Amino acid sequence: MKCGKIKADIMDDGGTNMKIYVHTAEKKENGWYFLCEASLQGLQAKRHMLVDSDACAFAYILEAADAFVYVIMPKEVWGAIKEALRTNEPVFLVGNDATIELEGIHEEVAYLIENIAGNANYGEEMEQAVTAFFE
């Protein structure tokens, strides 16, 4: 299984959940800003993350009134995640109409990195990519 590339900023999975793709990360004076081209109106940080092994990406969960929205963070922004972990700087998601602080991202990513190392349940490609990048 190969790690996938970003194909769109917003993808509806056909059910009640959507995926928003981070396409760029920028460092500013007060933290990291992950940019996407999506509406963030009415969404709130859930303080929980998952892994999208098929896309070789981390996924931060946002809550809407009746669904979850997955913020997909592909390998292209892992450098920003690694630096935010190192410096403990806040991470914000910037959309077309709102900015949301991704609360708890440091603890969640640190947990995932530790859990993925040597764990074949995440898929060999994901395990190798995370281990190599975050060592």
Swiss-Prot record:
It comes from the Bacteria. Belongs to the UPF0738 family. This is UPF0738 protein Aflv_2116. It comes from Anoxybacillus flavithermus (strain DSM 21510 / WK1).
